[in-house]
Amino acid sequence: MKSYHPKSLLNDLQYYITPPHDCSYLENKSARMVFLDPIHRIDVVTLSELSRLGFRRSGDFVYRPECHLCRQCLSCRVPVADFQMNSMQKKAWKRNQDLTMTVLPTRQASQIHYDLYERYINERHADGDMFPPSLDQFEKFLVHSCTDSFFLELWKDNRLISVSTCDLMDDGLSAVYTFFDPDEHRRSLGVYSILNQIEYVKTLGLEYVYLGYWVPHSAKMNYKSQYTPLELLLDGQWRRLNRSLSPEEINQLGNSLMTTLPSEWNNLIIK
């Protein structure tokens, strides 16, 4: 698969790197981030190029991890034309066929969206760094955007039960964040929301759903490896993971990334 290198336009942009700080994924590890100067007003094409280079958007900020002796934050994307549901995903898909999807620009967010977000954070992530939720946090994180962002809403009759915040890309969409009704745990809405995004990208005639970063040594991130085939940005190349990995293989991959040296990961598994 081909490497992606910054075009002249991207070389003209200004970037900043943060001082080391506690890693939000791995205990007892430090992290650094490269940020695009927020003074730049970027369009879909520029954000798409940056995403192919491993950048990610959060609110008005576009960033990429740049850590010393660690490369575990692997940008990952699902090639939608080749994606095949596993048995668990098929069950989640079937279980939610009574839901209706609508699309709404994030700038049209209302109280109903914040109320659902607040419940989700309070009940599902009270131990995380997004607790306690606030309207200001919600707006800065999910409503404000430097690009074309939208909600994929899921409704049960007249009740909003799930919202996926997405960025439009020139080759697909980037899944920014999903929140849902914590009382609907039997629906597996986290799984279904990703499946719904994959199907939505197919209807647009585009190629990928970007799932952000997969961190092999972070158990809470390993759900992303279940969407196969999955493409990973390794050593500047998008390489394909053709099947789900065992816990031992995931740990082996994580160990190989605790260095700044190029990966020698098994080419029979990742191609």
Swiss-Prot record:
Primary localization: cytoplasm
One Gene Ontology cellular component annotation held by this UniProt entry: cytoplasm
Top-rank taxon, per record: Bacteria
Matches recorded under Pfam families: ATE_C, ATE_N
Keyword rRNA-binding: no
GO biological process, one term: ubiquitin-dependent protein catabolic process via the N-end rule pathway
E.C. number(s) listed in UniProt: 2.3.2.29
Family (UniProt): Belongs to the R-transferase family. Bpt subfamily.
Protein name: Aspartate/glutamate leucyltransferase
